[in-house]
Amino acid sequence: MQPIAPCNRSAEEEGEAVAVSSRHPWPRTDHNGCVPTKKKPQVTAAAARRGELLSTAAEVFAEHGYNATTVRRIADHAGMLAGSLYYHFDSKESMLEEILRTFLDELWDGYDSVLASGLGPRETLEALVTESFREIDRHRAAVAIYQKESRHLVAQDRFAFLADSQRRFEKAWLSTLERGVAEHAFRADLDVRLTYRFVRDTVWVAASWYRPGGRHSPEEIARQYLSMVLDGIAVRE
């Protein structure tokens, strides 16, 4: 008995393929003698819609605050019924978690690349600041949520990853500043912890006023910011 091979079919014919019955383990053929194949699921459209809903939810959380935001409010902004939103997410907590995890994962991809590049302390500081402003450009609403809500969210087991990320932030920035002092790139009398807090807060607060697509790119804002900060902490020649 000759094996049955799939036939070459058009996209329209592929969509009409017949599923193999669980009661008949051998492949059944269609009227052309072809092995039927299942239509591939359209995952890209669903993923795109999910991304749109997360973007909408992030803007609502950032504007109204997490506690004051309901699933219905998010659904209203997305132009859909609240029940339809549950098709994509089981709760507003799951939406917020995904928003924050996506932001932090992308941020740490950039930070880890900078920290592994072997740059000097001044160049590392410049690169970390620039990467931070790029993340504000990509995830402005998520940064605003992180700034306003993380202190309260870390008490929940679901958001314990925020505390872990904060510890990584502190270690990365403090080690860079301490290395700069040790290598005489930064002033010897620099209070590294105070400087870290100043830089951290003044960078992230930009999410409250920065709007993507404005007259200044994130790189330009980073250059302007660094010109002020580095004039204050760098060793004067």
Show where each model-derived region lies:
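Helix-turn-helix
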Residues: 52, 56, 60-94, 98
